[in-house]
Amino acid sequence: MMMMGEGAHAPPWQQHVASPVSGVEGGGGRESEVVAAPYHLLDTLRHYLPSNEAAAAEDEEEAAAVAAAVDAYACDEFRMYEFKVRRCARGRSHDWTECPFAHPGEKARRRDPRRYCYSGTACPDFRKGGCKRGDACEFAHGVFECWLHPARYRTQPCKDGTACRRRVCFFAHTPDQLRVLPPSQQQGSNSPRGCGGGGAGAAASPLAESYDGSPLRRQAFESYLTKSIMSSSPTSTLVSPPRSPPSESPPLSPDAAGALRRGAWAGVGSPVNDVHVSLRQLRLGSPRSAPSCASFLPAGYQYGSPKSPAAAAAAALYSLPSTPTRLSPVTVTTASGATVTVEPLDLGLIEEEQPMERVESGRALREKVFERLSKEATVSTDAAAAAAGVAPDVGWVSDLIN
């Protein structure tokens, strides 16, 4: 008797599954049987392959380089002293325009302002095509050297403000970014002697406080002017001043002299000071000679102008009466017929007096002269009258004095 199921035999099911890895269809049998794995599991396994470690390292280095470049663009110290100054370690294997470092043969290369003495002024020869002095030139070569110089970088506001989208901007976008230079660095900003050393601390120039208009020079000049005004009192204006200014007198450049003539400083330029300055320029050869108009006028002053307040004061000074240089003999005849001849008065005593008294008050001088004449005439006539027994007539002397 035949058992159920023994006579029928079903063939095995042939699985034709395409391998997701090789893409080749497998045949029958156990070797051809491949279990289909999900694709997300294969993607997860790929991260552990040895070939992916080098790529990951390159990605990390590139990201770090980009982050460093971004930080470098935002730092003022880096831009002034390192941007296009430090040589790049990667060489030519990347885009130079995206790199903040210097490369061989790059036109944007800068000289280190801490090593080379050059100002922030553009070199005219470099603009024309080339400078023969090279790195020894005292002026800036190129836009980066000019505007990234420590004396010029972010010393002016940007016209676009916070809306500026430049990768490297030379100007300040906010008041906090605006750099204020010390006076010593401001003095040397446009001069080749003003070497940029803001990061390391530039030494102050010994001439920083001696330029025209500095507080020290102005104070010295005001002190000198005050002393000159005090010495220009009415009792000493005709005393001949020294040929050269005193030692405390500060030297003045043409610009400072022009500022003095324009009255740029406080207390200078007023009519009174103009008169004092003109009086300080007096050059009188002899106290007996009348003052000359040319000797009163210093260089650069135009007293001929009718609008000048000092012209009127100078004209009034020139119009004062002058002292006669020689006196003729005086003959006096009394009522009794006696004749008395008086010799010219010795002017040696008058020269010892203050010269300003002779110029300032001619009437007082005449009174003194006639007073002495009257005394001498009185002595002579008294002797003659005593001999003749007649009283002298001195009424004419009183008329002259009055």
Curated annotation (Swiss-Prot):
Keyword terms, alphabetized: DNA-binding, Metal-binding, Repeat, Zinc, Zinc-finger
Positions with biased composition (Polar residues): 183-192
Zinc finger (C3H1-type): 117-144, 152-176
SMART domains recorded: ZnF_C3H1
One Pfam family cited in the UniProt record for this chain: zf-CCCH_AtC3H23
GO molecular function, one term: zinc ion binding
Domain of life: Eukaryota
InterPro entries from the UniProt entry: Unkempt-like (IPR045234), Znf_CCCH (IPR000571)
Ranges of biased composition (kind: Pro residues): 242-253
Comp. bias intervals (Low complexity): 232-241
UniProt KW Zinc-finger keyword: yes
Region (Disordered): 180-211, 232-258
Name the UniProt record assigns to this protein: Zinc finger CCCH domain-containing protein 35
Source organism of this protein record: Oryza sativa subsp. japonica (Rice)
